[in-house]
Amino acid sequence: MESQPVIWYCHSCSNEFQRPGNCPRCNSDFVEMVEPNTAPEDDPRAANFVNATEFNDPNAMLQNILQSLGQGVVPNVNPTDANRTANPNTNSNPNPNATNAQPNPTMFSTGQFSTEQGLPNVFFGAAAAQPGSGTPFVMPGIVNAAQIRNFFQNIMGGNAPQPEANSEQARNANTETSNPPFASAQTQGQEHRPSSPNPAEHMTGAYVNTPLNQPPSYAASTQPEFQQTTSPIFSSSSTPPPPPPRPSQPTSGESQNTNPRFPFSAQSFVFSVGPNGALHQVNTSTENPQNAQAGAIPITDLGSILERIFGSLNQPGAQQGEGEPFNPANMFSNIFNLSGNPGDYAWGARGLDDIISQLMEQAQGHNAPAPAPEDVIAKMKVQKPPKELIDEEGECTICMEMFKINDDVIQLPCKHYFHENCIKPWLRVNGTCAICRAPVDPNSQQRNNTSTDSANGHNPSNHANPSTSTTNDQGATLRNESFNAASQSNLSSEHGHSSRTPMDDFVDEEPLE
C-alpha cells in the first residue's frame, strides 16, 4: 500500500501544500507539518472540519457560521411548560443573559423555529428580543427572509407606513404574505401564542407593517412616525419601538403597485431643489402640471432611474406611448440631471476645440468656392518656369519648394505659378488661386452670384432680365446694377472696345509673389 504524502498546513490562510517551505499562497512561514498518522485531536485542520450532517441541515450550518463570527445562539425568554415538555433538552430555569446556552437540536432538524425573532446580529449588534414577551426560543442568529426584505426596504426608503384595510381578514392576509416561509411553523404543534395579535411587533430593530402590494411614497417617509420607526435599525437598544398608527384610507396621490414581486417600484413623490436651494415636494403621478414647482431640479429616486435606464431595453424603436429606445448616453443624463444631449457638452481638455472644429467643418461647405471644371483644368498650359522666376528663387506656395529649371509649372490667369502636380489636385477641390483666391473659371463669378441670390430667396430670372426687376429690396437692386455693369464690360471687351478682361478685377497691379 502506497504511503500518503506529508501535508504542510499554513495557519495564516489554511492552505495545504506538499513542498516544505513558506506558504505558496500567502508566503507565510507559520506552517506545520501534518503526517498521515497524526491523531485527529492533534490535527491543526480539525478546527475547520465541518460535520457531514450539517450539509443536510442548512440551519445548523448557519448557526455554525454565526458562532464562528462570535454571534452565539442565546435563548432570550423563559420557555413555557408546554415547551419544556416538548423540548426536554432545555434548561428549566434558563438565564436570559447567559451566553453559553445551547439551542435545541430538534429545532434545527425540523425547522420549527419561531418567527418572532430579531434581525440578525451580524447586522445590528447584540440585540435581543424582550424578555417576558411570550416568545418561545427567540434565536437572533436565524436569518428571516422577511426581515432581510424589510431591512432592504428600509434602506431604499420603501417601508413607510401604508394604509391598510380595517378588516381582520386583510390583516391576516398581510401577515401571511409578509412571512410566507414561517406560516407552516406557526401551525405545527405550537400551543403557546404571543399576546400581541401581530407577533412581528416584538422583533428587534424596526418593524413596519407594509403590504407588499402597496409601495410607500416619499411623502409618507417624511412623517415623524417613519423616522422613529426606522431609527432603531442601526442601534443596539433592546426596547422595540411601538408600531406606527395606521391610516384608515389611502391618501391622495399615492400610486399602488399591483405586482407584489416588485416592491421597489418608482415612487409617486420625489423631492426637488428650487432656485433658492430649498427642498420642494413634487407629485409626479398627478396629471396637473401646476402642482410641480416651477424651475425645480428633480432629484430622482433609484426606482425612477432604473425605470428610465432599463424601461425600454426590449423596444425595437421609438414608438408613441412606448418610451424612447435605449441609449447608453441617456444613462448619464438621467443620473447627473444633464439638460439636453450629452454630446453637446465639452468633455475633457480638448472638448471645446473639437466642438469649434466640428462647427467650422459644417459651415465650410456653404460659402466655399466650387471646384474648377475638368475642361478648364485640361486647357491649362504646362510650361517650364521662366528664367526670372528661377533668378528670384520663387517657390510653389502649395508644396513650399523652390522652382527648378526642369520642373513643369502652370501659370494661372492671375499670373501666379505652381507645380503641375500641386495645382491640379488643388483646383479639383477649390477652384481658386492658392495665393490670391482668384477664380480660374471666368464664368464662376456669375454662377456664384446666382447661387447666392437663390439662397437668399431671390428669383434668378430677375438677373437674366434686369430691366424687369420690380423688387423693392435695395440690396437686390444694387446687385442687379453691379451685374449689369459687369455684363456691359464683358460685351465691350468681346467687341474690342476695351483690352480689360474680367479677370483683371481680381488681380492687383502688383501681384503677390
From Swiss-Prot:
InterPro entries: RING_finger_E3_ligase, Znf_RING, Znf_RING-CH, Znf_RING/FYVE/PHD
One GO BP annotation of this record: proteasome-mediated ubiquitin-dependent protein catabolic process
Composition bias, Low complexity: 82-106, 229-238
GO MF terms, alphabetically ordered: ubiquitin protein ligase activity; zinc ion binding
Ranges of compositional bias, category Pro residues: 239-248
Protein's name according to its UniProt entry: Uncharacterized RING finger protein P32A8.03c
Top-level taxon: Eukaryota
Zinc fingers classed as RING-type: ranges: 396-437
CC annotations in GO: cytoplasm; nucleus
Region listing for Disordered, in residue ranges: 72-113, 155-262, 439-513
CDD domains: RING-H2_RNF126-like
Biased composition (Polar residues): 164-189, 210-228, 253-262, 442-493
The keyword Zinc-finger is assigned to this record: yes
Keyword entries, A-Z: Metal-binding, Zinc, Zinc-finger
Keyword Zinc: yes
